[in-house]
């Protein structure tokens, strides 16, 4: 069984540092921001950034297909105001181009929020339009939609939202999904027992389909079940408990995709990675 576990590591000081940070915690996969995620604008990646990134990647033996870049949290492709949506779209395109430059084939993003100004469907249509515009203007990068906890006016908390965006897509070969365990749980999808896990994963397969699953975020949840609150926790310390992660590590449908920790204490990521691998039966 081939599981590729890692964490969302820092790219502080340059993207080329991310592979080294992943290697330091014993990761076989990783996520990163390819630019400062708190700013709209960022200076372009230099030739040196790109060359060193590739060099460091080779040294640490992590394959590009096991890297899941994440876009900036500022981006809202479903923004109700056209000017702000346009700003988000331009920033999103820039993120996709950065992935292209680094030879990375995925970009993970949160779908968007209606800010209580438009309906959920209108918001989903805006997100779908932005995705299609991005697909038209780029190549080689799969847009990976993350499920959300449904906090505030964030969409993506139902599997049906993810399916809707896939259905509206002009190129389904370049769209995928990332499942975040904490978000699933907070949105009302239980994974705490084998029975609950199987039921949730069956629903995911029927509504979205495992062929679209391009990665997972492995998090426990501080927030209660179905609370629609997005609060991550260290594995086994939250409301989900360790069994769910044991089910994940032994589920062959989750082979060969990046399984990324975004748990709250980065000083124990190496231990959490070890723990997850120890679950493999």
From Swiss-Prot:
Coiled coil: none annotated. InterPro entries: AP_endonuc_2, AP_endonuc_F2_Zn_BS, Xyl_isomerase-like_sf, Xyl_isomerase-like_TIM-brl. It catalyses: Endonucleolytic cleavage to 5'-phosphooligonucleotide end-products. Its EC number is 3.1.21.2. The keyword Zinc applies. One of its GO terms (biological process) is base-excision repair. Zn(2+) 3 binds at residues 183, 230, 232. GO terms for molecular function: deoxyribonuclease IV (phage-T4-induced) activity; DNA binding; DNA-(apurinic or apyrimidinic site) endonuclease activity; phosphoric diester hydrolase activity; zinc ion binding. Zn(2+) 2 binds at residues 146, 180, 217, 262. Zn(2+) 1 binds at residues 70, 110, 146. CDD domains: AP2Ec. Keywords: DNA damage, DNA repair, Endonuclease, Hydrolase, Metal-binding, Nuclease, Zinc. Its cofactor is Zn(2+). Binds 3 Zn(2+) ions. Endonuclease IV plays a role in DNA repair. It cleaves phosphodiester bonds at apurinic or apyrimidinic (AP) sites, generating a 3'-hydroxyl group and a 5'-terminal sugar phosphate. Belongs to the AP endonuclease 2 family. NCBIfam families: nfo, PRK01060.1-4. This is Probable endonuclease 4. The gene is nfo.
